[in-house]
Amino acid sequence: MSMPVKTITTEKYQQNFSLAKYLEANVKAPLLWSSETPNLYIIVLTLKDHKGNVVEARSSRIGFRKVEFKNKHELCVNGKREYIYGVNRHDHDAWEGKTVPYERMVQDVTLMKRFGFNSVRTSHYPADPAFYDLCDEYGIYVMDEANVETCGADAELSNNELWLFAQMERVAGMVKRDKNHPSIIFWSLGNESGVGANNAARASWVKDYDPTRLVHFEAYMHNGGSRQYGYGIDFMKTNRPAVNPPEPPAVDVVSTMYPSVEGIIKLATQEGETRPVLMCEYAHAKGNALGNHQEYWNAVKKYPRLIGGYIWDWVDQSVIRKDSVTGKEYFSSLNGTNGLVFADRKIKPAINECKKIYQHIRFDYSNGELTIRNEYNYLPLSTFRFSWKLMAGGELIKKGAVSYTHLRA
C-alpha cells in the first residue's frame, strides 16, 4: 500500500495543522485483540524519495478490535459482552515518587492480571507511553484520562470560554498521542470539573476525531456539601428527571463516584435513560475496606445497565523513609494509603477478595457433583491446569489433578 506525498501536499487546506490523508487497506481475518487474547501486529510506515531511497521509517504495534455498546447498554468488545473489573492508578513508586521506573509498571500490569483486573483508569492524567505498551501486550482495557481537573472550583472553568482552549489542548494532545493503542477503549475528558459547555465541545471533538472509542466524563458539582448530579438533581431521589451528565449526546456512559449499592441500582433502573452505568470511582480501599464488594458485583451482574467500575485505588501513595533513631525503613504518607497494594507493591488482603469475585471460572458443588463453569469469552478450559485437594479438619486427605482433555469449553 503506497501513496505519493504529492497527493497529500497538493490538497488545499486553510491551515497547515489540518493537513492529513488517510491510508486504508483491508486485512483479511486478523487475530482480534481483547483482554483475554491480546493479539498484536506491527505496522511499518516508510517514507521514500523520488528515487525510491528510504528517507525515514517508523513502526508501531497495533491491534484489531471493535468496541461498542450493544442494545444501548451492553459493553462489547468484538461482539462479546465485557464487564469492567477495573482499578484507578496513580503514577507512584515507593522509592522514586512520581517518577515510576519501567519495572514498576511491569509489576503493576502483571499484578492486575494476576488478581483478575481487566481494566485501568489513568487517574487523572495520561500515563507514560510505556504503560500503554504494556497494557497492549498483557491485555488490559484502558480508560485514558486527560489532565483536566478543577476540583474545588466545580463547574466554574467548564463554563468559562477563556479556558476552552487550554482544556481542549490537553484532551486533543492525549488522543493524538495515544490513538494507536488497542488497549484504550475509553477516552475520559477529565475528572471532577463540573458540567459545562466546554465539556460538550471537547467530547464533540473527540467523537469527530476518533469515532471508534467511547467517551467518558464524570461531572459532579457540590451543593450544600452533597454530591449533585445532572441539573442539580440528587440521583438518589426516585423522582429525578435527569442524570449525570446533562449532555446526553456528548458522552456514552452514565458515570458516578462512590455510590451505595442501592444508589447504582436506582441509576440502573431509572426510567427515561438507556445508557450504561459505570462507577468510575468506588469501593474506596483505605485500610481494611471492600467489605461489601461482593454486594456491588451481585448488583452489577443482576441489572443489565451496570457494566462495572474502577476501585479507588491501586497503590498507596507513600514513600520509604528511614527512622532517624533506629535506621529502620517505614512508609511515610500524608493520608494516601488507599491502595489495594502497598507502595512497594506488596499485596493487601482486600485484593484477594477482588480475585475471588472477578474469577471467570466458577465452581458449584451440590448433590455430590462439582460443576465447573467457564465465563471467559475466548479461553477454553483446556487453557488452564486444574488441581484439587480434599481436606478434613484442616488435614489433607487426598489430592489430584484433572486432565484438561476431559474438560469441555
Annotate each language-model stretch with its function.
Residues 1-129, 134, 138-142, 170, ...:
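Secreted/periplasmic carbohydrate-active enzymes, especially glycoside hydrolases
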Residues 109-112, 119-340:
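Substrate-binding/catalytic cleft of secreted carbohydrate-active enzymes
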